[in-house]
Amino acid sequence: MLLQFALPAFVQKFSSFLLGCTIVLSACSPELVSEFSILATRSETLTNEPTNSSVDSNSETTHIAWDLVYGYLELIDADNQAILANLQSFQETLNEFITQSNETKLQALRSSWLVAHTSYELASLHRHFSTAVVSEEFNLELLQLQYQINHWPILPGYIDYVDDYPDSGIVNDMTVSLDSDNIRQQHGVFDLSESTLGFHVLEFLLWGESTIDGVARPATEFAEISQLSEAQLEASFKLEQLGNNRRREFITVITSALLEDFGRSKTIWDQTNLALRERIDTFTAERLLRIFVDAISTLLSEEILIRSLYPLLNEEFSDSIQSPYSKSTPTAVTAQLNGIERLLLEIRSDSGKSLDELFISFSPDYEESFYASFDASKECLVLLYSSLQNFQTSLSPLQTEFDVVECINLVTNTIDHLGQIDVNLSN
């Protein structure tokens, strides 16, 4: 039995994006229409729509809002630099592992992946904020880059062997060239889940299908083979065609591509950051607060509800858990929510005000109601994803269903409390 309820109104943004994507079809693939059905609708709406602000442009509130945006831009810069440093560290650790492929080095590489991926998820809110301030052209490119950097779910059998299919995947298909251009062309060529790029392809290569038997991929599968066996010689194999050697090459190519893709997205943001700083004083406080409210709301709706909780309600476990191979979904979701808290509480204006305090001034009930829902949502989500990490031994289907519905209700309430600020801004 599945509990029935209506999807919230924000899902209706889907049609707006399809229309916009039709207009710029040459820059937006059909796959991205499906993958990013909502993200790109906000740029024109939030940056170009006229506002009838109830806040005077010279008011203290407006100057506080400007200060908070400046502070947030600095945080985005710092986070992007941290992600870049973590990715570079991952690449260095990978090089060490390729040189000496043992279990100790593999564990260090997995730890490095977790650090890099968590730092990327911590910056999730920035990407939702950027859609409101980045040009339409750059928005489309950022959406494509996001698909290349962090798409999930992936189809593991498209990458490497899986249970009962020991010869599956690009790693074992010697007809597939592993040069960077071809690997990029293979990414989502037939289906969105047929990924060859990004964090989660690396995740599967590093851990393997450990959800099946609880045993992660051994380091021996990355050990270089420098001599062919008699059977391989008779079959006319070449060293570069062997699974171990292809796996080593594949993970190296993907890592370089990830660094390249994130570097490009950072460049786009750096350019946008400079341009935005020059025109902050053209934004009213109402407009800026709406951008912040929308960024938080859409992160919760798109990343948590639409991509994960709603599919989980239909028992689509394999497609709803972000990091099943490393079993780090609770960490990733916690990082996303921590990113929201940093924006609300840690950034201060010159007068010492936080965005949280500014929101309270527009919605007196916000302080108690928002955080009650937000904190409960975080606890619910961590418990849910922790219980589902080993979904073959998880709770009963009925218990899981009720847990998912509870999380959906809490996250939806959190979004509704933010929406009240939006309403009060117009009063």
Predicted regions and their residues:
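N-terminal secretory signal peptides that target proteins for export/translocation
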Residues: 1-11
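Residue-level marker of intrinsically disordered, low-complexity segments enriched
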Residues: 9, 21-22, 53
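Sec-dependent signal peptide recognition
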Residues: 12-20
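C-terminal motif of bacterial Sec signal peptides marking the signal peptidase cleavage site
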Residues: 25-27
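Bacterial signal peptide processing site
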Residues: 29-32
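Cys/His-rich zinc-coordinating "finger/knuckle" motifs
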Residues: 34-36, 414
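Short, low-structural-confidence N-terminal segments
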Residues: 38-43
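Mature extracytoplasmic or organellar-lumen-exposed domains after removal of signal/transit peptides
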Residues: 46-427
